[in-house]
Amino acid sequence: MSYGGGGYGGRNGGGYGGGRDGGYSNGHGSHGGGYGGGGGGGYGGGGGGYGGGGGGGFGGGGDRMSNLGAGLQKQDWDINALPKFEKHFYKEHPDVTNRSQAEVDKFRREHSMAVQGSDVPKPVETFDEAGFPRYVMDEVKAQGFPAPTAIQSQGWPMALSGRDVVGIAETGSGKTLTYCLPAIVHINAQPLLAPGDGPIVLILAPTRELAVQIQAEISKFGKSSRIRNTCVYGGVPKGPQIRDLSRGVEVCIATPGRLIDMLESGKTNLRRVTYLVLDEADRMLDMGFEPQIRKIIGQIRPDRQTLMWSATWPKEVRNMAADFLQDFIQVNIGSLDLSANHRITQIVEVVSESEKRDRMIRHMEKVMDGKDSKNKILIFVGTKRVADEITRFLRQDGWPALSIHGDKQQNERDWVLDQFKTGKSPIMVATDVASRGIDVRNITHVLNYDYPNNSEDYIHRIGRTGRAGAKGTAITFFTTENSKQARDLLGVLQEAKQEIDPRLAEMARYGGGGGGGRYGGYRGRGGRHHGGGGRGANDLPMGGNRRW
């Protein structure tokens, strides 16, 4: 969706689409309306949905094909022959200049901030100190933010200085604005796009959900500058994305596979890219995108400015930074060791597989106490089938639950996310694919129905709550089949000074047993109540005994 014209669903009007009475109906259900149903250009209907795009699963199932990019020509860059571009915009505010090194060190300590590299600029403590032009500041102040977050305080001066930057910070730390606002300044300093030009700013993201959220921020803050953008990702038709690219966009937010598809078919080029962002770099590598990322970066001039953002700093991410960034400066917020957000209360219960559903209902009754409850709970399960089974079970028991996973169509996923965000359906069941990149405010509880494959995924899952300074609660069911993960989990809990279930400590001490398997040994049995799974769990009418 390029900025300009039309309702929320694209250039061609259409707005939000569909009636609001029924559940998701995909345009053919019996609930009257549905979400974007009828094809008249609703949220995802018609051409020009929320960002368009086709092929690939949840974040690009098709994005993982290693032969993607085989048709791209290797570029032989002559730096001296390339047009010059401007990337140095930072002018230190007098208040920042006058701050002593001792004051700077104190500020960094208070915000758990560490920096590395040569000539790292001092952090800013207010929006005005960042020195953004008025057209940017007006948009920021209109949002009512009290002060920059820690990553913004240090990241803005770094990005505006034109340097290559690495930022390591937990999800929900405000990193999107850390690179989006300098991107807007960067664009406005470059020559206007000519016909046939590709984007000036390229942002690579691992999943379509994260890409759409980044697009929303760029649209919001780039509005006054009339900056055009598009989202390029798999799972939806290519037509709207191709139209946006052919009309010209200053910003392209993309998942790697679909972007390579567009490059190979000549629908865009990266010759004008001078500001490159790799968001959630660790997640992109986890998902196997490194070959595609390397092919894409090979199409971009080497004197570009590159910013890499990651929640963790493993060897693979360090290697990528060394390969693609030059003389970079780095900011870390919090510990580089694997650790959970300390604002999250972590409750781990050692249970048998057959106990899970009853335990879940018990927690739901506490969390969702009364219709006036403002709580939102995100439930993680190990497989798509179990996601549907649990959703059916909850709906039949009177709970307003919806599920999201890779087999859902894009417009259904958008609808589910909207219902969850607005609180109309405050319970969402998700597979791991939703654990990163979905930015839903005010999730108060995360419930790990199935324990994930490793402690990194555990930390990313529970990081959906306790964001932006809020507190949260994470409830986790842990079985003997997960015992190989017990020692790592115990370390995470101890680091965050959480209460330890004695049975978990015993498992960690003796280790062994069970385990293996993609999801810590979980076999997808779904406990003793088999809800039948299958398609259409989100369509199922809620049981007569409404629990919320």
UniProtKB/Swiss-Prot annotation:
Residues 343-508 form the Helicase C-terminal domain. The keyword Hydrolase applies. PROSITE patterns: DEAD_ATP_HELICASE, HELICASE_ATP_BIND_1, HELICASE_CTER, Q_MOTIF. It comes from the Eukaryota. Residues 515-524 have a biased composition (Gly residues). It is an enzyme of class 3 (hydrolase). One of its GO terms (cellular component) is nucleus. It catalyses: ATP + H2O = ADP + phosphate + H(+). Its EC number is 3.6.4.13. The Q motif is unique to and characteristic of the DEAD box family of RNA helicases and controls ATP binding and hydrolysis. ATP-dependent RNA helicase involved nonsense-mediated mRNA decay and ribosome biogenesis through rRNA processing. Belongs to the DEAD box helicase family. DDX5/DBP2 subfamily. This is ATP-dependent RNA helicase DBP2. It comes from Pyricularia oryzae (strain 70-15 / ATCC MYA-4617 / FGSC 8958). The gene is DBP2.
